[in-house]
Structure formats: C-alpha cells, structure tokens
From Swiss-Prot:
NAD(+) binds at R12, I13, D34, K79, N315. The lineage of its organism: Eukaryota, Fungi, Dikarya, Ascomycota, Pezizomycotina. One of its GO terms (cellular component) is cytosol. The gene is GPD1. Pathway: Carbohydrate degradation; glycolysis; pyruvate from D-glyceraldehyde 3-phosphate: step 1/5. The active site is at C151 (nucleophile). It comes from Cochliobolus heterostrophus. GO terms for molecular function: glyceraldehyde-3-phosphate dehydrogenase (NAD+) (phosphorylating) activity; NAD binding; NADP binding. This is Glyceraldehyde-3-phosphate dehydrogenase. It catalyses: D-glyceraldehyde 3-phosphate + phosphate + NAD(+) = (2R)-3-phospho-glyceroyl phosphate + NADH + H(+). Keywords: Cytoplasm, Glycolysis, NAD, Oxidoreductase.
Amino acid sequence: MVVKVGINGFGRIGRIVFRNAIEHNDVDIVAVNDPFIEPHYAAYMLKYDSTHGQFKGDIKVDGNNLTVNGKTIRFHMEKDPANIPWSETGAYYVVESTGVFTTTEKAKAHLKGGAKKVVISAPSPDAPMFVMGVNHETYKPDIEALSNASCTTNCLAPLAKVIHDKYTIIEGLMTTIHSYTATQKVVDGPSAKDWRGGRTAAQNIIPSSTGAAKAVGKVIPELNGKLTGMAMRVPTANVSVVDLTVRIEKGASYDEIKQAVKEASEGSLNGILGYTEDDIVSTDLNGDNRSSIFDAKAGISLNKNFVKLVSWYDNEWGYSRRVLDLLVYIAKIDGNA
C-alpha cells in the first residue's frame, strides 16, 4: 500500500522531499501547504533548482493546485497548521518542514486537520527522535509527532553505531564541515545571537555550534554524554562531511575498522551507510540517497584506540530520502502500509 503524504513548508527540504518522493514507490505526495508561496511560484521553484538541476518531469498549475506528471497535488496556503484540510486528500502522514512547528504541541496541530502522524524534518526539543538504521525499530504506534533528527545526526549516528557496537566508544568529538544553508547571509548582516553567523556565507569559513553529536545520545542511549561537536560552515552549496574522532575501548587497526564499516554498509545498514575507497570530493556526492558515506582513504589513526573517521553526506537529498523512509516505516508499523 502506498502512503499518502502531505508536506507543510515548501522550502528547501520540503521541495527536496517532494522530488525524492517521485523516485519513492511507496510514497504519494497528495497535498502541499505553504502560506508564503502561491502555486505558480511553487511550480517554478520545484522545476528549477540551482543545486539539484531541473525537475525531470512535467509540472503545471491547475487553478490553485499543482499537476505533477499528470497527477493533481492539492495546494493550500494556510498559516495555521490546524486549518490545513489534510483529510480531504487522505494525507494522514505529514512532513512538517517549515522549521517553525518543531515542538510536539505545535506539530500536533496538524492532527486537527485530519493528519494522524507528523514527522518533523528537523531536531525537536521534545518529540521522540528517530534515525533510520539506528533506532527506528523503537517506534511505537501511539507516537503522534516524531523527529527525523538533523542531517548531521543522520550521518553521524549510523557510523557511531557501527564503531560502538564493535569496539565500544569511550568518548569522542565531532566536527561537521557543513555547506551553507538558508539561515546564513549572502552579504554581512545583523545576527545578534550569532555574530559570526551573520558574516557572508560565500566568502568565509564560519565556526558554529551544532547539537548533532549530543543528539546521537538520544538515538543511541549508551553514547549519551560521550559525544559532542561543532560545525564549520564553508562556502559550498551542498554536501557536507563529518569528522569523528573517538577513543575506543577495544583496540583495532584502521584496516580492521574500515572492514567493520564496509561489512555494515553491505549488510544491516545497506542503503543508509555507504563505503568508498575512491578519491572523491564533495560534489561527487551531490544527489546521493544515503545518510552517510564513509571515506576509507580520508581517515587516520594514532594508535589502536584513537582514530579519526570521515564520512560524507548530501545534507539535502540524503536527509530528505530518510524522511520518506521513516514515514513508510511508521505507516507499516501503524498498519497503514
């Protein structure tokens, strides 16, 4: 059974989720809501994308709705999530991608319009957090609003899980070298809460904070308090990379660690965790579906208990694919797929 899905917020992630859904046989996007984008502009933004290229399909506007590859997509422009009539199109599963309604209470407003479950495409201060391949099997059907965590947590957690399960992580530090995002500035501008974050994105490497490493402790409880990290925002449009430095309890050579990651990428984490020995750079992974692509050649070890691991991720495309995978999984558990 195909899962009918609605998207609230047709910004960066909302549109990339939509594009991913075209390739996802188990998902049917039936409705979109965005109070700040009218249908003609939505069609334009969906069709043309500076990072992922032109949409490979047919997009038209029919009244207040979109027609994509011959299929009608209801388009709403409600500011209040409680007023979006999701039930009219059978959109019982909603992707909350505005970045605004990230608490459980705010996300559950969608239920008033007929939605049954809401997946928040961002970290949430109080909603249960799930990362595919790591803790998704702990989902219970009574959960109405849940978070797909962040793109960085989705990259870091599968790798950390493999290393911890095999060698036991004592402690670690993470740095994500992260492409700029919409929250940054085209030119220097005011940013009272983060002075460095107000500097122009395309000219600077900008140190920043991230909760991604600490969030791993929420999806892998054994690592709670053992990981923390920071971000370096860099002048690239897409694709980011995690640098994870850990002390491990059970000593292992770097070759042994590579083999463990390779086996996981071909087994239980296939499609989520990748492995490469190619001499890749960031643009080579633009549009990659996986959450995390381990770069075997980029890592180093000081000794058998202290190692630096490097893993890439398309922070837009790969993350959006996991949003859909999580939706399909919870629908299956709920008995609706």
